[in-house]
Amino acid sequence: MRSIYLLALVACSNSSGPAPDPVADDDPAAVGVDVAALSGLGTVTNVHAVACNGAPMGSTCRQVTVTGCPGIASEPLDAVVAVRPAMGTLRGTVVHFKGGGGEGFQGSDQNYEAAGFRNVYISWLTDWEQTQSAGIKTAACRPATILQWVFTEPTLHNSSRTLGFCGEGFSGGSGQLGYALAHYGMGSVLDYVNELSGPPFTRIDIGCNGDAPPTSMVCGVADTTRLPSSLNAWENIQSPLKCGSTSVPPSELARWKSDSIGVGGVYNYPKTQVQFFGCTFQATAVTVMGNAYFNTISQAEGGNPNLAQYHCYFQSDGCQGEQLGTGLSDAKQALIAGCVPRHQ
């Protein structure tokens, strides 16, 4: 049976004992208010129609180029943007981000169209996290830029404040949304966000540090904190170091920490509701990391359940690893109810 955890129950995420959550942020300056983008955005260019190969049925597709992101201005990246129109009266726009490197289309089986939502699916041509020498936070300018473009594009959301503008991401896709909120000011445009199994990049310095605690308690279950080897390339970790190394130099740990979603960003989103859905059974690090991001938001927002909630799922709910079981249908209903205009 699933459980919903609000700030008043944050202790339950560490219920096995009094030890502090190893993923909790110890930097009191790492909370803030909903302000303009902390990091600059790039530009969407070269917009043109393309065939919808592999896109959800009924989509029309455009390929775009994201360029000009600070720190990686000479490293443009293309994405395919697939759009499925709403059925009936239009209620808003939902932007979807897939896990891993973001190649492919996430969330088409949720069928939000039937509830009146235009669906926009982002598929990167290569891993959005990958840069020549920077880290994931710098690369996260790319999804934030494309999110801002969808919001303002006249043929898409057209900057409407009478319709909901919302996001949904799975695993690494929830990381795209997490960075957009925490480090790129997207709390100023997003009304509602579903974070499904993630985000995984809340504390890279803990997830990649072989000397850090290997597990953390989430909803009474000890789940892994260890991030996968894909972080080696995405975070440009130089050999002989790797994600999972022990005796990591302090300067490298500091870089990993600085590149994390949960450090040094904005975590108070007074006009954005964020809901998290995580599986505790045979979980990957996305469960611990997603719970840590939720805790950071909840603390910044005073535990307001209208702004942030964390939904736990267990083996009895049919979840396993990053798959949510009954949580997927709960997430669908939460978005349908929560994707309403809040920035009016």
Map each language-model feature to its residues.
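Ser/Thr-rich, Pro/Gly/Ala-heavy low-complexity intrinsically disordered linkers and tails
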Residues: 1-3, 7-37
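A short loop-to-beta-strand scaffold at the N-terminal edge of the catalytic core in hydrolase folds
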Residues: 62-63, 70-86
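Short beta-strand element of the alpha/beta-hydrolase
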Residues: 80-84, 89-99
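Conserved alpha/beta-hydrolase
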Residues: 112-130
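Alpha/beta-hydrolase active-site loop
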Residues: 132-159
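Primarily recognizes the serine-hydrolase "nucleophile elbow" in alpha/beta-hydrolase
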Residues: 160-220
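Serine-hydrolase catalytic core
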Residues: 225-316
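Catalytic active-site module of serine/aspartate enzymes centered on a nucleophile-bearing elbow/loop
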Residues: 314-344
